[in-house]
Curated annotation (Swiss-Prot):
Gene name tied to this protein: xseB
Catalysed transformations (reactions): Exonucleolytic cleavage in either 5'- to 3'- or 3'- to 5'-direction to yield nucleoside 5'-phosphates
Name of the featured protein: Exodeoxyribonuclease 7 small subunit
InterPro entries registered for this protein in UniProt: Exonuc_VII_S, Exonuc_VII_ssu_sf
Subcellular location field: Cytoplasm
Alphabetized UniProt keyword annotations: Cytoplasm, Exonuclease, Hydrolase, Nuclease
Enzyme Commission designation: 3.1.11.6
Gene Ontology molecular function terms on file: exodeoxyribonuclease VII activity
Subunit structure: Heterooligomer composed of large and small subunits.
Length: 81
């Protein structure tokens, strides 16, 4: 359940960030509102980056070697296209 919540939090943060970018690109915000939106965007970006880093660290390929499992970092180059 915690994984689903984390995924939803990431998805919501990303959606919020995209909405902020659109508002900033429209140029209809005052300077103060733009700065507030920018600050919120920086926080959301950090949250998203943190979630991605955690996910990357969790994604590992398990290989059986000599009867023991060893962990290797995930390499996205191995994925079929």
């Amino acid at each position: 359940m915690a994984r689903k919540k984390a995924a939803l939090d990431f998805e919501q943060s990303l959606a919020d960030l995209q909405a902020l970018v659109e508002r900033l690109e429209n140029g209809e915000l005052s300077l103060e509102d733009s700065l507030t939106a920018f600050e919120q965007g920086v926080r959301l970006t950090r949250d998203c980056q943190s979630a991605l880093t955690q996910a990357e660290q969790k994604v590992q390929v398990l290989l059986e070697r000599d009867g023991e499992l060893s962990e290797e970092p995930f390499d996205d180059a191995e994925l079929p296209e």
